[in-house]
Amino acid sequence: MTQRLLEHPFVRGLADGTLDRDVFRRYVAQDAFFLRAFLKAYALAAAKCDDFERACVFHDLMTGVLDELKLHRSYSATLGIDLDDVEPYAATTAYTDFLLRVAWHGSLAEIIAAMVPCMRVYQHLGNELAASLRPDHPYEQWIKTYAGDDFGQLCARLESLLDEIASNSPAVHDAYRYAMQCELDFFSAPMESAP
């Protein structure tokens, strides 16, 4: 699945800087909508923690999402997006509905399993794309954000929690697999949808 994401036209366009600005604008709007749900899911995960240290990890992860939303707000000004008035695409709705359903009704392990793919995919893409980043790249800030050490550390902390508490339950595996498919669908939606 990761290889399919790397070969996806959206990611290839992001990598070489040829991604159409309108496609990126639509992506930023959808991602901001998604990140609000991601933030809520982290908050619900923190509420399910009996362990103080685990709750602190989710606090840091929520701070990371807020930092991502700040990046999106900076894009919104230059791209002409009202991030408070985003109509979600079907792929975005499917992903956020799944994420919030798991966050409300799933175990802590299931919530983490549903969230790790997003973190891991973005970190992996950021690192892969940063390897060939040129100075005048139009999406340089996006790439640097997800290739950065801060994001990488957050990703590692979430994965460490998953390793620590995950069981071999089918629900945990299913949540992870479905979230990976949602990532692929999410990258496709801005390319297929007209404003």
Question: For the regions a protein language model found, what residue spans apply to each?
Answer:
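Active-site-proximal alpha-helical scaffolds that flank and shape metal-associated catalytic sites
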Residues: 29, 53-150, 177
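Short alpha-helical hairpin
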Residues: 1-19, 156-165
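Alpha-helical bundle segments that constitute or directly flank the non-heme di-iron/ferroxidase center
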Residues: 4, 18-48, 67, 113-123, ...
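Domain-length accessory/inserted modules outside core catalytic folds
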Residues: 37, 41, 47, 112, ...
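Structural helix-adjacent loops and short alpha-helical linkers that scaffold large soluble proteins
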Residues: 3, 49-54, 170
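Long hydrophobic alpha-helical segments typical of transmembrane helices together
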Residues: 164-195
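Short, contiguous, pocket-lining structural segments
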Residues: 19, 26-37, 64, 150, ...
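Short, flexible helix-adjacent loops and helix caps
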Residues: 15, 19, 43-51, 104, ...
